[in-house]
Amino acid sequence: MNYAIVFRLLGYIQMIEGVLLLLPAVTSLIYAEWAVMGVFLLTAAISAALGLGLRTIKPRSKVFYMREGFAATALSWIAISIVGAVPFVLTGCIPNPVDALFETVSGFTTTGASILPAVEGLPNGILFWRSFTHWIGGMGVLVFLLSLLPLTGGSHVNLMKAESPGPQVDKLVPKVQSTAKILYGIYFALTVVEFCFLLAGGMNVFDSLLTSFGTAGTGGFGFKNDSFASFSPYIQWVVTIFMILFGVNFNAYFLLLLRRFRRAASSEEVRAYFGIILAAVAVITVNIRSLYGTFGEALRHAAFQVGSIITTTGFSSCDFDLWPTLAKEVLVLLMFVGACAGSTGGGIKVSRFLLLGKTLGKELKQALHPQVVAPVRMDGKLVNHETIRTTNVYIAAYIFLFGASLMLVSLDGFDMVTNFTSVAATLNNIGPGLNQVGPMMNFGAYSNFAKLVLIFDMLAGRLEIFPMLVLFLPDTWRRF
C-alpha cells in the first residue's frame, strides 16, 4: 500500500469539502442564522486544516494501483461523512454522533434515509447542507476531484473504476480527466434545467434548489415532513421526469450532444430501463386505481413512486405503504433493479440484470446443445469473460452482505418487512422502506449498532461493495 499517496489524496478531498462547507454558511448568513453560520465556518476551517496537513505528506513513489484506488475511495467517503456530520452535532439538530453520521452518510451516498421525525423546523443552513450532500455525492466526490487535478499514470482510471457505478467504466473521450469534466458538465446542466422548471411552477428559489440537488443526486432528503405530497401535480410531474432522466446512463447524453441519436437510442440498457418503468407504472396504476378519484391521479402517483424507487431517489408523493400488496411488491422489486450504470442512481443496476439474463440464456442453450458456441453480447459488442465474472462476484458479494446485514439488524426485534426493506433501502441507496421505515416514517428507532450496520450498507451500496470490503483484507494494508 502506498500510504503517502492515499493520504495526500484524502488531503485534496478534505480541502474541497472545506470549500463546499462555505455554501451552507452563506445560506445561514442570508437567513440570519448566526450560530449555524459559525458552526459551518468552524467545520470548514477544520476540514481545510486537515486537508492542508495531509497535503504536506510527500509520496516517494507515485505508483497508484487498484489497491490504492479502492482504499482511497472508501476512506474518502468515510472521511467526508465524519467531517460532514459535525454541523449536525454542533448545532444541536442531531446531538447523537451516530445519528448525525447516519444522516450525513445517507446524504453523501444519496440514500435519503433519515433518523429525523420532522425536518420543517430545521435551520435553512442545515436543510441546505442535507440536500447539498446529495448533489456532491451524486456524481461522486472522486469524479469531481478527477475533473480538477492532473493525476499521473493510471491513477485516473483506478480511481474512477473504484467509485463509478456499474459493471464497467466507459471513457467518453481518451483522457479520463476530460471524461470527468464532461460528466459534471452534463450533471450541472440537467440540475439547472430542472431548477428552472420548478421555478416556473411557482416553487420558491430555496425549495427549487433543494429539490434539484436531491433529484440530481437521486437522493431522497425532503424539506417537508410529507416529502412531495403537498406539492402541485405540475411539481410532482417535473420531479418524476427528472428523477427518471438522472437514472439514465450519462454516456447516452454525451452521444446526444454529439448528435449520435441512433447509437444513444440503441442502448439495450436504456431501452430495458424505460421498458421496466412503463411496465411497472402500468401495473401499479391499475392496482391502485380504486384508491384515487381519477385515473390521472393514480397514474401520477404510480409514475412518481416508480421513478423514485427505480432511480433510488426515495422521494414520496403519497404514503405508498398504504397501497395494495401487489403495488408494494413491485416497488420492492424495483429497489433491487436500480437505475442504469453510469447514472447517479443506485441499486444492482439494469445492465447487470441484462448480463445475468443473457448469461443464463447462454447456459441454457449450452445445456441443450453442448457443442454450440453462444457468446454474450451487449449493444452488439462481445462481453468479455472478465466482465461476466466480475458481475457474478458482485452479485455473490451483494447477497452475502444483504444476508449478514439482515441478521444483524434483526437483533433489534422489528418485524421481518421492516428489517428486510431497511437493508434493501440502505444497500440499494433508496431511502424509505416499508412498515416502521415507510415513506412517512424514519430510521430513528433502530439502535446505534443497527444504524452502524446500515451506515456500512449505504457506503457499500454507493461504492459497489468492493471498496468497503477490501478494507477488511490484510493484503490491502501491506506496504510494497
Predicted segments with their positions:
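Membrane-proximal intracellular helices of multi-pass ion channels
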Residues: M1-F480
